Design a protein with these regions (language model features):
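Helix-coil modules at protein/domain termini and other flexible surface or pore-lining loops
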Residues: 1-119
């Protein structure tokens, strides 16, 4: 069955995902989530955003997974889930991304389910 199109909610081909910023490259990451099943996936330090998205979706493992967060070199993404649903945010640090996701969720039941940072 074909994978549905990638849906990206704004916040915010190299053989290896590991390339170096000093060489002028940017690292990319993504967080994917499927609300009904709670499946999730994440990726970080990929050479292209497409590679990061595809790897997060593959890790999520459900054909209905969608990318909820994207982040680039030196940034982090975090996904908080509560009664009102999933909330993904980015930040310059892990603490900032987690705090922003929890504040967006704004529910006592919210908890950060996954996070990732790029180099």
């Amino acid at each position: 069955m074909p994978r549905p199109p990638i849906i990206i909610v704004p916040p915010t081909v190299y053989p290896s995902p590991y390339v170096y910023p000093e060489q002028g490259f940017t690292f990319h990451g993504a967080i994917a989530y499927q609300r009904r099943t709670g499946a999730l996936g994440y990726s970080f330090d990929w050479a292209t955003q497409r590679e990061a998205d595809v790897n997060a979706l593959d890790q999520c493992g459900d054909p209905q997974c969608v990318v909820l967060a994207r982040f680039d070199s030196g940034y982090c993404g975090a996904l908080a889930v509560g009664a009102q649903g999933p909330f993904a945010e980015n930040g310059a640090t892990l603490d900032e991304a987690r705090t922003k996701a929890l504040m967006a969720c704004a529910d006592p039941s919210c908890e950060v389910k996954v996070w990732a940072c790029t180099k």
